[in-house]
């Protein structure tokens, strides 16, 4: 494996806010960088880059045109331009399976010259750059046409109807006229299976007027009403994603609804169904409630993985009978990625998850590595099956853009952070034809790597600011800013008698209220006046002295003079504690019982006025004698 990897130079295609360029490395221990002989074009308007599946061609848009380059395996060879296509607004690019054709898609637009609109899906022959097909395709989500593996069949869905074009040897019509059609209802979807020639194909029809949604399998060219190979119907499906295995013998359907009528999920609900070209169909059993995050086929075409359920989600490996053959357990993950040989799988949690990545040996069912790839928006295995790249790209994240290359053991092989003010928009590996690399032998040996230049996030638990000083044994109030007024003493600004008259009045009312409750609610037993202890300090200021000289002297109102003022001890409640602070447990109990007696007194008044009381209120009145005895006992013990 190592020898094969050294013979082929790994190349990364990079699209940024300033250029489209290719980077390469001389080996696993050498850094990735742009070589002088590799293409680099400065452009701020590139929207798409694309390799053909066999790695022969590389295409990109630059805002003026689309260029197609011929790729080279030689580390010293250049990449010549094969053709230039006049598509300045190209938004998506896609090669046919063998790289003979390039499809371009751009946003549909209407102009004064062409009010009916211009074709926005075009197909070009790569060798000559000649346009061979053009059509209006308004659907952006499912714009990609379908191809058979040998490129003999070209198909696409327009307005819910699937159109087929025969391009094989001896075909007379080619792209000029459709050879077959199927469907016709709105929202239809088509997918041609790989591997077989002629291929199997799946056509999905959404449900309408109470009829269920339906997916049918056909063997091309037998597309008649009674020529279906398999059929699967389901009611809960507003949308479906069709996933073929590499051999084209099995199809997975990920169905989803936009709204969950049960209210269990904000994002609707999902289900996974399996269809085989032999005619078998079944639903994939899921043992945990919640959404289906990811479904992926193994390149071996005999197994598939499903990541599902509320967080922490579950991940399980299934066989072609839809039986669970291995359970990866639960964890913070929502993505799964098989390497090109299917002997390694990476389970990851990206998006709103912290970026934990687990690498598993699929054949031995054991975990090989745990690593953290925070803020990852792109994950892709290298064709050699041993490396993978992770990247943080815009517009998903516009800060800390860059990419890293890892070995499956978790070792970091390369790291490049994008310069400040620039954005990394896209990155992908050069593809290679089958059997270019041999399947790697998986070992537990740790690979030598480099240390990341990015600081690691703190693993300590978050502590709120108001608790940080308490953990250090300090009083937080000591560090709070104190209010101050120029020319006044600090204590006066903090709330002396004359510093804030409203606060002083509130304190007096609070103190009188507390004493009223203790004395049974008699207002005449309240203290004469509550004196703020900060007042003498505040009056030391010249400003307050002058204010006191001008202030008229008023005697306290007689209604607040207590009848037993001379008999009250100096430290009685209300005088010793003007703000109602530091009261004893016994005083607190007296307050509570007095409050209950006050409520009973009000209830009795309401009853005497003819008001009908509730049963619990009548029971409360019956407790009056018990509360009076309790209050008497508390006062005697005091």
Swiss-Prot record:
InterPro entries: TIF2A, TIF_beta_prop-like, WD40/YVTN_repeat-like_dom_sf. GO terms for biological process: regulation of translation; sperm individualization; translational initiation. One of its GO terms (cellular component) is cytosolic small ribosomal subunit. Gene3D superfamilies: YVTN repeat-like/Quinoprotein amine dehydrogenase. The lineage of its organism: Eukaryota, Metazoa, Ecdysozoa, Arthropoda, Hexapoda. Belongs to the WD repeat EIF2A family. The modification Phosphothreonine is found at residue 463. WD repeats lie at residues 287-329, 331-370. Residues 492-501 have a biased composition (Low complexity). It comes from the Eukaryota. Functions in the early steps of protein synthesis of a small number of specific mRNAs. Acts by directing the binding of methionyl-tRNAi to 40S ribosomal subunits. In contrast to the eIF-2 complex, it binds methionyl-tRNAi to 40S subunits in a codon-dependent manner, whereas the eIF-2 complex binds methionyl-tRNAi to 40S subunits in a GTP-dependent manner. One of its GO terms (molecular function) is translation initiation factor activity. This is Eukaryotic translation initiation factor 2A. Residues 441-450, 583-593 have a biased composition (Basic and acidic residues). Residues 441-593 are annotated as: Disordered. Keywords: Initiation factor, Phosphoprotein, Protein biosynthesis, Repeat, Translation regulation, WD repeat.
